[in-house]
A protein has these predicted regions:
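Short acidic-glycine-tyrosine-enriched beta hairpin
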Residues: 54-72
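Ligand-binding loop in jelly-roll beta-barrel domains
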Residues: 71-91
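Transition segment at domain starts
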Residues: 1-19
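Short histidine-centered beta-strand/loop micro-motifs
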Residues: 28-34, 50-51, 58-60, 77-79
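Short, conserved beta-strand element in jelly-roll/cupin
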Residues: 34-49
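Long, compositionally biased, intrinsically disordered regions
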Residues: 7-11, 66, 86
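Conserved short histidine dyad/triad with adjacent acidic residue
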Residues: 15-35, 67-71
């Protein structure tokens, strides 16, 4: 999985979501804007993170494994049981 570039800095984060409150848009393919990176940070539980392009890659995220979202790359998530997480955006 990619790492955040050293030059990007966090500028906002989402509220904490659970399996019951995750926005439906995150469950379907979507992407960040040009120049916007993000980290999916798990507080509790497991989240399935799928990168849809250029090749499909699925990663199980937990407290030790954070998901890195590259700019303009299609991706989606799926809760695996009970989960709490948030997303931190950087540019």
């Amino acid at each position: 999985m990619k790492q955040l570039p050293e030059h990007v800095k966090p500028y906002k984060k989402t509220p904490e979501f659970t399996q019951a409150t995750v926005p439906k848009g995150l469950l379907n393919d979507h992407q960040t804007k040009d120049g916007v990176w993000a980290k999916i940070i798990i507080v509790e539980g497991v989240l399935k993170y799928t990168i849809s392009e250029p090749d499909i890659e699925t990663i199980m995220l937990d407290k030790e494994t954070r998901g890195v979202i590259e700019p303009q790359v299609l991706h989606h998530i799926a809760p695996v049981g009970n989960v709490r997480f948030f997303i931190e955006f950087s540019r």
